[in-house]
Amino acid sequence: MGHIEYTKKMSATPEALWAVVGNPNTWGEWFSIHERWMEEPPAVLAPGNKLVAKVVMLGMANKFEWNVASVEAPTTLTLTAAGMAGVKVEFTFEIAAAGDGSELSVQGDFEGALIKGALGKAVEKDGLKQLEKSLDALDALAAA
């Protein structure tokens, strides 16, 4: 099992961040592992929603069936997903006010037969790199 977590001070307000995070149609602009939707996503995220996407990590494509586990707008979103080769993931995004901007914390867990040993460590390393890149792009988009 792999685990990543990252917290970043964001210049955008919590409401501006939520407007982007909570809108699946923006994910291609900031969520770096997201390549494209394979099915039209819902306009508004609600518990139980299913979102089918092509994602890329470590240069490898995978089809993820994201499920919205919980939503507490505008502060928390938890997504779970099942992918090919038994890959399972869970991501939680938590947004809090911090001064003039926000603090965004993301935690992610990965598991599956392939995510062990050296490959598990590579997934964690790439996942953290992608998460940092994603949050930079998210802040720029939300603050625009």
Role assignments for model-derived ranges:
Residues 17-21, 27, 51-53, 68, ...:
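Hydrophobic pocket/interface hotspot
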Residues 1-46:
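Hydrophobic ligand-binding cavity/cleft-lining segments
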Residues 8, 64-70, 89-97:
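Hydrophobic/aromatic beta-strand elements that line small-molecule binding cavities or substrate pockets
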Residues 38-83, 133-144:
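Glycine-rich portal/gate segments that line the openings of hydrophobic small-molecule binding cavities
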Residues 3, 48, 74-76, 99-103:
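A generic structural signal for beta-strand entry/edge sites
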Residues 80-133:
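Beta-strand/loop substructures that line and gate deep hydrophobic ligand-binding cavities in soluble
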